[in-house]
């Protein structure tokens, strides 16, 4: 059985064997890609805190994740909640565009071979994954472990960029955001794992049009054979992994905004990610969508106490 830090073990093992290669830890507390107050009833009276919970989530992940001595980069993220606007089908498009450029500039300056990204909502995978796709000349497959496929587009009902993250990695989406990305990942090299809520029929249709398979949580409940089989035929030697914490079963832990029932167990996710790492070289790992609901409420309580407020 893998320990709780199992999803980190592949990085340290490969660091031992590939000392000349460089891993960076990218702290990316982007929240602008989401508008989620309706899904957080305990924060219904404070939509700003609901969205900025992603900012705190990234800080918490950074605190909790093992420190293996990698260089740490922190993307500067605005916390200004005033006048959130939808531009060309994307909420807070201009802030996201600016922050995407900053993240890419930092990665190009650091020139890492592998990237651990701690977010932040799901769109934090877009820049590091496309950076890696460019670095390895397309020799990269993408596995998206999530409760939702994140295949929406500008003009769909929901304008949150975090729901467009997988499509953006493939080069589809709002033209200015896509124009700054250094590469795209071909849909033939994309696998969804654990999807259990498509939200709207057109999203499922879009997935079918792109030809992207989904391996359900039930299919990997006992082993990762279905994922291994896909990896052996994907045509890439390297892989990037997106781990949205809402894939986890809320009956075991509520770690994210999404609480769709019948998710994957923590030990299953840990085993799947380690099995992927045993099959291919993992060059990117994102942990995203941490929403520390209790910590947010404690923070709000502290803000109202004497000598603290």
Residue ranges and their predicted role:
Residues 147-151, 197, 245-247, 292:
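Short, glycine/acidic-enriched loop or turn micro-motifs at the edges of active sites
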Residues 198-205:
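Short, glycine/polar-rich helix-capping loops at beta-to-alpha or helix-loop-helix junctions
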Residues 144-147, 170, 192-197, 216-218, ...:
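Short, structured patches in soluble enzyme cores that scaffold and shape functional sites
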Residues 114-179, 280-283:
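Active-site histidine-anchored catalytic micro-motif
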Residues 1-17:
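N-terminal amphipathic/basic-hydrophobic helices that include classical n-h-c signal peptides
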Residues 19-116, 128-137, 209-309:
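Catalytic cores of soluble, metal-dependent hydrolases
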Residues 29, 119-122, 147, 195, ...:
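Short, well-ordered beta-to-alpha junction loops that form the rim of enzyme active sites
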Residues 119-125, 197-198, 291-293:
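Gly/Ser/Thr-rich loops at beta-strand to alpha-helix junctions
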């Amino acid at each position: 059985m893998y320990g709780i830090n199992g999803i980190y073990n592949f990085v340290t093992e490969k660091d031992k064997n590939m000392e000349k290669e460089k891993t960076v830890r990218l702290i990316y507390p982007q929240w602008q890609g989401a508008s989620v107050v309706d899904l957080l009833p305990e924060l219904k009276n404070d939509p700003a805190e609901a969205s900025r919970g992603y900012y705190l989530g990234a800080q918490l992940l950074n605190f909790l994740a093992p420190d293996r001595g990698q260089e740490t980069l922190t993307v500067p993220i605005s916390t200004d909640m005033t006048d959130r606007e939808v531009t060309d089908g994307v909420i807070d498009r201009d802030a996201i565009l600016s922050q995407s450029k900053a993240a890419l500039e930092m990665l190009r300056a650091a020139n890492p071979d592998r990237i651990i990204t701690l977010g932040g909502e799901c769109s934090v995978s877009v820049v590091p994954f496309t950076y890696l796709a460019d670095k390895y000349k397309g020799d990269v497959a993408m596995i998206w472990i999530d409760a939702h496929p994140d295949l929406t587009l500008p003009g769909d009902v929901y304008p949150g960029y975090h729901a467009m993250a997988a499509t953006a990695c493939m080069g589809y989406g709002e033209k200015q955001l896509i124009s700054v990305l250094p590469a795209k990942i071909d849909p033939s090299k994309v696998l969804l794992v654990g999807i259990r809520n498509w939200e709207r029929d057109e999203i499922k249709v879009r997935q079918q049009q792109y030809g992207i398979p989904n391996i359900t949580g039930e299919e990997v409940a006992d082993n990762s054979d279905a994922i291994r089989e896909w990896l052996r035929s994907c045509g890439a030697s390297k892989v990037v992994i997106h781990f949205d914490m809402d894939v986890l079963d809320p009956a075991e832990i509520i770690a994210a905004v999404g609480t769709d029932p019948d998710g994957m167990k923590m030990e299953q996710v840990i085993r799947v990610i380690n099995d992927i790492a045993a099959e291919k070289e993992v060059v990117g790992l994102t942990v995203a969508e941490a929403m520390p609901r209790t910590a947010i409420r404690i923070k709000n309580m502290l803000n109202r106490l004497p000598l603290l407020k």
